[in-house]
């Protein structure tokens, strides 16, 4: 029975991106010798398993592709807030030093199965969940690695409205951080390989074996199309 797991990234789901500016003379309040680090808030996985009537699909359920009867909808969300301190050199020039970065991460998983579905289909969709949660295990370290190089960075800004220019720059850094997080996280190829191994849940390959094989061999075996990961 065909099934589907949908990976949706935060950039397309309205992830909050905030830029904040502390517009004052630069003065460090951090103890001497302490290197600045970004703050990472990694939320627990939010998981729900839901059933539906195939003849009356719930309004909040993602659409099923043709021929599919169930799906695993995994949403990786991220938001970043960036703060800076400014040293103004004249009326139209300033240097902004990045002093604080906070990245918040979330993973929301919903498995949708029709009433009366077989246990085999449920297990297949749960395999997609396992893959998503595997990638999320190290998401905090990934976000920290991406955000860390921006800490302490000094950016020259110019303009007649230095406050607006500073906020624009901080917002762009926040966007760059979340965009890079989405790009590098990338569980899609592993989900595709898992579907190739299991024939989208149609064969009798044991789910735990398929998940383990996909996670181990993705770098050398993933040659599947890049559309609809998790089918």
How should each PLM-predicted stretch be described?
Residues 8-21:
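Hydrophobic membrane-insertion alpha-helices, especially the h-region
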Residues 19-31:
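Membrane-interface motif at the C-terminal end of an N-terminal transmembrane signal
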Residues 36-97, 103, 150-231:
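Metalloprotease/metallohydrolase-associated module, dominated by Zn2+-dependent proteases
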């Amino acid at each position: 029975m065909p099934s589907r797991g949908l990976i949706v990234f935060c950039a397309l789901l309205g992830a909050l991106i905030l830029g904040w500016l502390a517009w004052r003379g630069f003065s460090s309040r951090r103890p001497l010798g302490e290197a600045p680090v970004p703050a990472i808030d990694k939320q627990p996985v939010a998981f729900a398993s839901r059933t539906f009537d195939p003849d009356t699909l719930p309004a909040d359920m993602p659409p099923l592709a043709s021929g599919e009867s169930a799906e695993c909808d995994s949403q990786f969300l991220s938001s970043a807030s960036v703060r800076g301190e400014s040293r103004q050199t004249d009326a139209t020039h300033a240097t902004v030093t990045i002093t604080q970065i906070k990245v918040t991460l979330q993973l929301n998983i919903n498995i949708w199965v029709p009433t009366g579905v077989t246990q085999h289909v449920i297990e297949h969709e749960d395999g997609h969940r396992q893959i998503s949660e595997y990638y999320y295990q190290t998401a905090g370290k990934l976000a920290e690695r991406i955000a860390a190089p921006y800490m302490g960075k000094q950016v020259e800004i110019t303009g007649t409205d230095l406050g607006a220019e500073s906020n624009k720059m901080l917002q762009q850094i926040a966007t760059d951080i979340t965009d890079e997080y989405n790009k590098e996280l990338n569980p899609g190829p592993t989900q595709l390989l898992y579907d190739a191994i299991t024939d989208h849940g149609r064969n009798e390959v044991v789910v735990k074996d398929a998940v383990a094989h996909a996670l181990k061999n993705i770098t050398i075996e993933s040659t599947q199309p890049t559309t609809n990961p998790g089918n």
